Curated annotation (Swiss-Prot):
Disulfide bonds: none
Alphabetized GO MF terms: rRNA binding; structural constituent of ribosome; tRNA binding
Similarity field: Belongs to the universal ribosomal protein uS7 family.
Keywords tagged on the record: Ribonucleoprotein, Ribosomal protein, RNA-binding, rRNA-binding, tRNA-binding
Protein name from the UniProt record: Small ribosomal subunit protein uS7
NCBIfam families: rpsG_bact
Gene Ontology CC terms, in alphabetical order: small ribosomal subunit
Length: 157
């Protein structure tokens, strides 16, 4: 058993435009090399494009809906039992759900062709909002893996 105390979670203040903690975490994930102002410009620009294309009045609500659609419920974790490694399906913790969804959205937005991250991010958010695209496919693949390995669910720890 560990003798150390659990690490304290940092409290992140909300972003300056919408006051949302979730959006500020998303901005932090988009940020590269400590350039937060550029990350903010990219995210706010993408949100404006996203809201304009879908005809939403509040881009934050649409963003939260898109993020909710991308969150995985189950995932598989490797568990070694007697020389064999099993992929054990486990439920994803709420913080990890949103973290994984953000990572997947950003990863697929960066992999889109073209130079402008703002446009790629807006397109990926639109796809998530409409429950389609690469991020949703990744979520479905994760769920499919968990479903396929349901037989090993009794190895949970």
């Amino acid at each position: 058993m560990s003798r150390r105390h659990a690490a304290e979670k940092k409290v992140i203040p909300g972003d300056p435009v919408y006051g949302s903690v979730v959006l500020e975490r998303f901005i932090n994930k988009v940020m590269l090399h400590g350039k937060k102002s550029i990350a903010r410009k990219i995210v706010y620009g993408a949100l404006e494009r996203f809201a304009k294309r879908l005809g939403l009045e509040n881009p934050l609500e649409g963003f939260e809906e898109a993020l909710e659609n991308a969150k995985p419920i189950l995932e598989v974790r490797s568990r070694r039992v007697g020389g064999a490694t099993y992929q054990v399906p486990v439920e994803v913790a709420p913080d990890r759900r949103s973290c994984l969804a953000m990572q997947w959205i950003i990863k697929h937005a960066r992999s889109k062709p073209g130079k402008c991250m703002e446009i790629g991010l807006a397109n990926e958010l639109i796809d998530c909002f409409n429950k389609q695209g690469a991020t949703i496919k990744k979520r479905e693949d994760t769920h499919r893996m968990a479903e396929a390995n349901k037989a090993f669910a009794h190895y949970k720890w």
